[in-house]
Amino acid sequence: MTAQMTSEIFSHADSLPTDEERVVYLRQNHTKAVRELLIHNFNTNIKFLLPEGRPDLRTDEFEPQNSYFPNLGATDDGATLNYEVRKMYLFIEGGHPNLTALKRETLWHELVNSLHPSEADDLWYMKDKKLQEKYKKITHLVAHNSFPEGVQQPEAKPKRDTSGRFTKPEKPKKKKAKK
């Protein structure tokens, strides 16, 4: 049996009604690609050395799925993200310091063009750390609860008062000693 694509797993998890169900589903159906996409997307210490956004490519230049495997049938997916995710170190800070920016971008385009369009789309979102924009219900907290060993716990956002200013967290008041 072939592994599910990341887009199938994320779409199904996104359609579940509660965060607890999403966490259980992601744990039961995780693949290396799902785990790595969530870790790279939500880990603030990982910085991609690629330009932000998608390049303006002509459609004849951008042919995801089967670009490396022209003889595969219509049911075959070509390269899968589960296999290709091992190359992520090439695109992050500190991963391969001797790689030039041009070579890094060339390798990125080759990687994206070798994947199924939905997996390539997930990769683009992950690179810009915007996977939660595509899958609205897969939040940082869901990712952390699914893979606590890889995804940092989300930091609490500061609260604002009615005028828009940040409020300080209330500290417990110290009791004065009676004399």
Language model regions located:
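N-terminal nucleic-acid-engaging modules of covalent nucleotidyltransferase systems
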Residues: 1-179
